[in-house]
């Protein structure tokens, strides 16, 4: 059989060896595995992480984890963030307004306000990769320090049961819908941004059997098989080449952030890694 799912449930139940998370760099002699504190999709400005700015006793604002930054390359069980690739439309004849979603909580987006105050964006689109598609629609993806990625909220997903996965899935949906609602309706968001986002809505003719919302959570990573050969960065950069190719990959080495933590009193994302490579045979 072939297990072509994101999760690899059949693979696991069949007793195939696998791993979850990030190997330590020492396992395969790599450089870009494990903990990575890079500049991509990062908070480049100092952002206070505490509910009451400057007061660590007030607790952390939503979306920031308790873990302490480990040395670069340290392995763990964290996985890169999931999100939804969002389809919206600005065609008024095909648009359903973005309404307040289930479980909406504006405190989840405090980081947006603090980032905007520290480094004002000139457009709401600066918070996303906002790719226009045919028929006045979009393919929206994560961008920057805070966006559609729900960083650190998916670690249980790969080996969770179906009920727990459904909870994680729903939390991602609520967060993402809430982000768009927040940007369009919270009066603390600059008026020009609210005006921009309110031009958009869910397309009437997409995902009609799922309330016009995509059926698929972007499960970027889950279980990974440990076979006779394990593909590592050495294959991706061309230092190792296989002679029994079964497939081709044509994208960069890419990991989204895995955690959001406090480093020296500031909010930082951890785990992003983007290494440009040439298309090459990947086993």
Residues of each region from the PLM?
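A short, hydrophobic C-terminal helix/tail in secreted or cell-surface proteins
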Residues: 279-283
């Amino acid at each position: 059989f072939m297990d072509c799912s994101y999760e690899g449930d059949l693979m696991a139940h069949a007793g195939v060896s696998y791993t979850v998370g990030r190997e330590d760099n020492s396992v395969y002699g790599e450089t870009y595995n494990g903990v990575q504190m890079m500049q991509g999709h990062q908070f480049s400005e100092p952002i206070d992480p505490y509910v009451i700015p400057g007061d660590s006793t007030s607790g952390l604002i939503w979306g920031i984890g308790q873990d302490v930054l480990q040395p670069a390359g340290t392995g763990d069980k964290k996985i890169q963030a999931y999100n939804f690739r969002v389809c919206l439309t600005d065609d008024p004849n095909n648009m359903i307004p973005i309404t307040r979603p289930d479980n909406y909580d504006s405190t989840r987006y405090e980081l947006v306000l603090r980032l905007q105050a520290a480094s004002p964006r000139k457009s709401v689109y600066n918070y996303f990769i906002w790719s226009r598609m045919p028929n006045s629609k979009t393919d929206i993806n994560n961008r920057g320090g805070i966006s559609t990625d729900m960083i650190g909220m998916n670690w249980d997903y790969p080996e969770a049961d179906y009920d727990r996965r459904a909870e994680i899935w729903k939390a991602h949906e609520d967060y993402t819908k809430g982000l768009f609602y927040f940007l369009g309706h919270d009066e603390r968001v600059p008026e020009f941004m609210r005006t921009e986002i309110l031009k958009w809505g869910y397309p009437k003719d997409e995902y009609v059997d799922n309330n016009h919302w995509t059926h698929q959570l972007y499960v970027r990573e889950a279980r990974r098989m440990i076979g006779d050969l394990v593909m590592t960065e050495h294959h991706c950069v061309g230092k190792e080449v296989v002679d029994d190719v079964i497939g081709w990959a044509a994208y960069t080495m890419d990991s989204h952030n895995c955690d959001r933590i406090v480093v020296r009193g500031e909010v930082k994302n951890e785990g992003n890694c983007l290494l440009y490579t040439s298309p090459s045979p990947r086993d």
